């Protein structure tokens, strides 16, 4: 795929920060990556390799020190409603209910009240929180809070979902369950228009289970070590975790992450 056909295109992006001592710290090496419309791509790599930095560049929260990030062929210059972000920390407004959190984005963009209400009903039901609309974040379990965060994100109808370890804080069983929920929600949200996903995770099995491709990054300054195609058809079933190809991919990625730079 050429950059012209990509939903997201990362072209020679690098990022350097200044440390407290005034030294230049290279967090992200030159990265080139194209992501197709409707594709689900995960990034795995060692801690501090620049995964979240790359996501922040694509979200428009940070500018690259060199190179360029594009969406639909246009440079990304800042945040925008066409790109939704879901964080590990849920990032819900504690003073708003589930319904209030989901309504916040569309309402703040001036969408008509009846349309906002319709979106709230639709997306709250999609993430299976109907009946909890009047609850506040502190009244929800971790899994419910993350589903609310996802509903709030997709209520803005973004083309691209940028997800930074959204399931990392959950217990193992809840995490496995929400992986299936995430795939279901992504599929339902993509019915009218494909949603492109960039997903950051430390969990190799999660990356394989969710993704069309897995990007393996090196130690800091992070560069792409390899891009691995995931061979499993969609919809995904939990049984693929026992497939020998699943285990072979897990081993391949693990060995890449263990390898010295």
Segments predicted by a language model, with ranges:
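The feature captures the beta-strand-to-loop junction immediately N-terminal to the Walker
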Residues: 44-46
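Short helical segment in ABC ATPase nucleotide-binding domains corresponding to the A-loop/adjacent helical element
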Residues: 87, 99-107, 117, 121, ...
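Conserved signature/switch motifs of ABC ATPase nucleotide-binding domains
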Residues: 135-138, 156
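Helix-to-loop junction immediately C-terminal to a conserved catalytic motif
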Residues: 59
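Hydrophobic anchor residue at the start of the ABC signature
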Residues: 150
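Conserved ABC transporter NBD signature motif
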Residues: 67-79
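Conserved ABC ATPase "signature" region
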Residues: 112-132, 184
């Amino acid at each position: 795929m050429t950059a012209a056909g990509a939903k997201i295109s990362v072209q020679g992006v690098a990022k350097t920060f200044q440390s407290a001592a005034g030294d230049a710290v290279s967090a992200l090496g030159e990265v080139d990556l194209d992501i197709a419309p409707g594709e689900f791509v995960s990034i795995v790599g060692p801690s501090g390799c620049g995964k979240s930095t790359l996501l922040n560049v694509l979200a428009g929260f940070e500018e690259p020190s060199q190179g360029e990030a594009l969406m639909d062929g246009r440079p990304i210059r800042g945040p925008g409603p066409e790109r939704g972000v879901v964080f590990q920390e849920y990032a819900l407004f504690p003073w708003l209910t589930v319904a209030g959190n989901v309504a916040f984005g569309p309402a703040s963009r001036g969408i008509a009240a009846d349309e906002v209400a319709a979106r709230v009903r639709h997306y709250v039901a999609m993430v299976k929180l109907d009946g909890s609309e009047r609850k506040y974040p502190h009244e929800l379990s971790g899994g419910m809070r993350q589903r609310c965060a996802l509903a709030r994100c997709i209520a803005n109808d973004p083309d691209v979902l940028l997800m930074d370890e959204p399931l990392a804080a959950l217990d193992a069983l809840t995490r496995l369950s929400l992986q299936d929920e995430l795939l279901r929600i992504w599929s339902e949200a993509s019915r009218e228009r494909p949603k492109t996903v960039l997903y950051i995770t430390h969990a190799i099995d999660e990356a394989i289970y969710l993704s069309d491709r897995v990007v393996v990054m090196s130690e800091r300054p992070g560069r792409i070590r390899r891009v691995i195609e995931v061979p499993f058809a969609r919809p995904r079933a939990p049984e693929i975790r026992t497939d020998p190809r699943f285990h072979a991919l897990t081993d391949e990625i693990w060995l890449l992450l263990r390898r010295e730079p």
